[in-house]
A protein has these predicted regions:
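Conserved Rossmann-like nucleotide-binding pocket used by diverse enzymes
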Residues: 26, 52-55, 95, 119, ...
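Flexible "cap/lid" subdomain of the alpha/beta-hydrolase fold that forms the substrate-access gate
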Residues: 13, 59-95, 99-286
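Conserved HGGG/HGGXW glycine-rich cap/lid loop of the alpha/beta-hydrolase fold
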Residues: 16-63
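Signature tryptophan residues that serve as conserved aromatic anchors
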Residues: 30, 34-37, 99, 105, ...
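Glycine-rich phosphate-binding loop signature in dinucleotide/nucleotide-binding domains
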Residues: 19, 87-90, 317
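Catalytic active-site module of serine/aspartate enzymes centered on a nucleophile-bearing elbow/loop
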Residues: 283-317
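A short loop-to-beta-strand scaffold at the N-terminal edge of the catalytic core in hydrolase folds
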Residues: 8-17
Length: 317
């Protein structure tokens, strides 16, 4: 596996790349890195693909603009297109996890000419509407803590998470994993609580995340901090206006959805299972793969099962 630096105007993008063949471009979520795709890079490179994974702007070795507006879906989708074009493929299969899923879904709709197929992990496609997700749930969470609302105040979450980066990451990764009790991430807490309140730092740590793996993330976030990554949560409020031209538009490319059975995303709206019909807004949906016992970090917690699901999807293209 090699690392290359590509550019979208003034934004430098650190990209891991391996193999030769049709391009699969993987886009990570929060709080992760291109490293989150280590199991997929190796596996699909050995099966005749060029596999690339980018550090999203704000993360790792990529540029870290300060302004919130730099982190809109439109801007990050342009980064994705720049990576595809500069690798020289012209077109790519996109795979995205967590915030990476809305990024690849949006790229597929905004730039259909460069996206041949799309796989979303953990977050189903939800077309652009008049309000952002965080604003749509403010009333639901008016009397309790919700992490996306907590993230809106600049500097607050950054200070909490950067006070002890190793402990913060250990708690975050465990809390959203299939190994944690079901209610840890969405535990009912007072409105004025902090993100890490009530989160466990388990010992020993689950085997899917080794000490060496954790060290990669810790060193990256010691360098980058958390402002850029959290700015994506703030910039979502700008997306409806910026993406008004594609409001309500479906994904038309071949698509699939993959998630862990115990993923917290499915319960973000109390009383609703967001994984019930993940292909509702996709016109060529090829199937949903829900992986037993896995949590939010599905491609790391269950790499063999995730790779098998992706391979099934790819074989039908």
């Amino acid at each position: 596996m090699d690392f290359i630096t590509l550019h979208n105007r003034e934004i430098a993008l650190n990209v891991a790349i391996s193999g030769k063949g049709p391009l699969i471009l993987c886009v990570h979520g929060w709080p992760e890195l291109s490293y989150s795709w280590r199991h997929q890079l190796r596996y699909f490179a050995e099966r005749g693909y060029t596999v690339a994974a980018m550090d999203v702007r704000g993360y790792g070795g990529s540029s870290r603009p300060h302004a919130v507006e730099a982190y809109t879906l439109r801007n990050i989708a342009e980064d994705v297109v720049a990576v595809i074009n500069q690798i020289g493929a012209g077109r790519a299969i996109l795979v995205g996890h967590d915030w990476g899923a809305p990024i690849v879904w949006t790229t597929a709709v905004l730039h259909p000419g460069v996206v041949t197929a799309v796989a979303g992990l953990s977050v189903p496609y939800m077309p652009v509407s008049n309000v952002s997700f965080v604003d749509s749930v403010r009333e639901i969470y008016a009397d309790r803590f919700f992490y996306m609302i907590y993230f809106q105040a600049e500097g607050v979450a950054e200070a909490e998470l950067e006070a002890d980066i190793p402990a913060s990451l250990r708690k975050l990764y465990f809390a959203a994993s299939g190994d944690a009790p079901r209610d840890v991430w969405l535990k009912r807490k007072p409105v004025d609580a902090k993100l890490l309140d009530g989160m466990e730092d388990p010992k020993p740590y689950p085997a899917w995340m080794s000490t060496a793996d954790l060290d990669v993330y810790v060193e990256a976030f010691r360098t980058s901090g958390f402002r850029g990554p959290i700015n994506r949560y703030r910039a979502q409020r700008l997306d409806p206006a910026e993406l008004a031209a594609i409001k309500g538009r479906p994904v038309t490319q071949p698509s699939c959805f993959i998630a862990g059975e115990r993923d917290i995303v499915r319960e973000l709206i109390p009383g609703m299972d967001l994984f019930t019909d993940p292909g509702a807004n996709c016109t060529d949906f090829r199937g949903s793969f829900i992986i037993p016992r896995a949590g939010h970090w599905v491609q790391q917690e269950a790499p063999a099962e995730t790779n098998a699901a992706l391979e099934t999807f790819l074989s039908g293209l």
